[in-house]
Amino acid sequence: SIFNNRKNVIKGIEARNELFKDDFPREYQTWTETAKTDFESEFNGNIAVDALEKRPEMVVLWAGYAFSKDYSTPRGHMHAIEDITASLRTGSPMSPTEGPQPSTCWTCKSPDVPRMMEALGVDSFYNNKWGAMGAEIVNPIGCSDCHDPETMNLHISRPALIEAFQRQGKDITKATPQEMRSLVCAQCHVEYYFKGDGKYLTFPWDKGFTVEDMEAY
């Protein structure tokens, strides 16, 4: 099997996507296709479109929120780092202590994030300026965000989803393989907020998942 003949034996957190290429060439190829920007549709496509220009009412609805400054429809995972770096939301910090946003904004952009959370601690990772992590967050969303690098099983690499389950009295480690296929996406593709002065990433799910539940929360 491939696990008995791996060319790159990976231990622990591995953020470098290219190290998975030799052992998982087909999966790596499909990942590289997220770099494409060749179609637009009613449901976004893969081209960055200025959503505020298309829907100017969102500037008013998002007033006081960073998305009122700039929001483009998302491109593929391979563009995650360059797109957030170019966004007006993050500004142009000239030093690690400047800029309008916390490093929490990096959370879903790179497999380097779990590496830095392990090195610094989750609280310390969030409680920094966005610019402070720029030299470390260099690999775009990829393999180890959703797969355990040692076993390639689906896994949750971001703490906010695990914590949201815990506050509901649920154990995410009991999720079925079928549920994990959704949950690996749910750790990032969700509504969230940055809690308190520490800008701790939090999902407002304590009372449920609907808009009304979140408003009640």
Identify the role of each PLM range:
Residues S1-R75, E118-P140, S144-D145, E150-Y217:
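Primarily the internal scaffold of c-type cytochrome electron-transfer domains
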Residues G64, P74-M78, E82, E98-Q101, ...:
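Non-catalytic propeptide/linker segments at domain boundaries
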Residues H77-H79, D83-S87, K109, H147, ...:
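Aromatic/pi-system hotspot detector in well-structured domains
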Residues I81-Q101, G131-I137, A175-E179:
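Short, flexible, mixed-charge glycine/proline-rich loop motifs
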Residues T90-M116, G121:
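A cross-kingdom signal targeting lumenal/periplasmic-facing segments of multi-pass membrane
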